[in-house]
């Protein structure tokens, strides 16, 4: 399928919208009440610091809603305002934040049901309005909705669209796309649907395994088994790893994406030599600015003397998880929560999700005496949620 031609055709359809409806002022008050925070604005103006008795809060200097998320949420609100009585669907969570998605449900936005990991579009009919979330949607989903006669509102982040353009470039020039991402993440599923031949690698360890295979140090059957669910149909590691381009899920850890890119460049240089490198490797730049800014701010924050860290964001949020990884890597006592309600003031306990583990509750959350708390949040977390976490910390510090 010529995905580039399909996108171009879809973008010219009268039933497709990716620019909003000119109703920003009409939804501004609702957005402000639901997601913005006067307290957070005050803390920003005070050098990202708050002192309250024995409590000393340090905010990361970049956190919370990024531009792409703000745009997607605002477009969803505009869509309901523009289509007040039409049946309105969304193909997935608009962003990885439970409170934001709950607000959409309250606005009678229906989420496409999922049965055993497969989306069920049978309830969507001609004339329905369907929102594509910030992560995007697969080209097959777009094609289905277009053929069904739906009105499509596309809130895909432009940074994600940039990655799609990158893998389409790989496909055009018969390069295999090495996608640094999580194979089941909505964004990676969408990106791979625009690629030709592709392979998804989760981390540097998997990338090194692939690089070793390219240089003749691997087992074909083991390779095929390991990446059976992370590659394009019919992928042949002996045929499809000769010409590589690198792309990424925009919310992955920036430093790891860059290292994976350098690894494959060195690998192809070693195998083919400098004169043929450009025929076998395509450089890339698909790292999202907002992801980079939040990670850089987190690295700065964890350099400060902190007693504990609170990271706020959806448990299925990739960019939030990577912020938690940064804190844990520095040995900081850090807690990843998805909503302020995870903190129980009465018992001084917190329900949180450790890395690669299930939810658990921990007592003696806020220690006695002077305490320095670092706070950050993922790109899908509104300021209002951060405010509510800080208010709970203030209450705990007064007990």
UniProtKB/Swiss-Prot annotation:
Binds 1 [4Fe-4S] cluster per subunit. Coiled coil: none annotated. The active site is at residue 187. The keyword ATP-binding does not apply. PANTHER family: 4-HYDROXY-3-METHYLBUT-2-ENYL DIPHOSPHATE REDUCTASE, CHLOROPLASTIC (PTHR31619:SF5). One of its GO terms (biological process) is isopentenyl diphosphate biosynthetic process, methylerythritol 4-phosphate pathway. Keywords: 4Fe-4S, Iron, Iron-sulfur, Isoprene biosynthesis, Metal-binding, Oxidoreductase. (2E)-4-hydroxy-3-methylbut-2-enyl diphosphate binds at residues 96, 185, 250, 317-319, 380. This is 4-hydroxy-3-methylbut-2-enyl diphosphate reductase. Belongs to the IspH family. It comes from Synechococcus sp. (strain CC9605). [4Fe-4S] cluster binds at residues 66, 157, 288. It catalyses: isopentenyl diphosphate + 2 oxidized [2Fe-2S]-[ferredoxin] + H2O = (2E)-4-hydroxy-3-methylbut-2-enyl diphosphate + 2 reduced [2Fe-2S]-[ferredoxin] + 2 H(+); dimethylallyl diphosphate + 2 oxidized [2Fe-2S]-[ferredoxin] + H2O = (2E)-4-hydroxy-3-methylbut-2-enyl diphosphate + 2 reduced [2Fe-2S]-[ferredoxin] + 2 H(+). Pathway: Isoprenoid biosynthesis; dimethylallyl diphosphate biosynthesis; dimethylallyl diphosphate from (2E)-4-hydroxy-3-methylbutenyl diphosphate: step 1/1; Isoprenoid biosynthesis; isopentenyl diphosphate biosynthesis via DXP pathway; isopentenyl diphosphate from 1-deoxy-D-xylulose 5-phosphate: step 6/6. Its EC number is 1.17.7.4. Pfam families: LYTB. Catalyzes the conversion of 1-hydroxy-2-methyl-2-(E)-butenyl 4-diphosphate (HMBPP) into a mixture of isopentenyl diphosphate (IPP) and dimethylallyl diphosphate (DMAPP). Acts in the terminal step of the DOXP/MEP pathway for isoprenoid precursor biosynthesis. The keyword RNA-binding does not apply. Its cofactor is [4Fe-4S] cluster. InterPro entries: LytB/IspH. GO terms for molecular function: 4 iron, 4 sulfur cluster binding; 4-hydroxy-3-methylbut-2-enyl diphosphate reductase activity; metal ion binding. It comes from the Bacteria. The gene is ispH. Isopentenyl diphosphate binds at residues 96, 185, 317-319, 380.
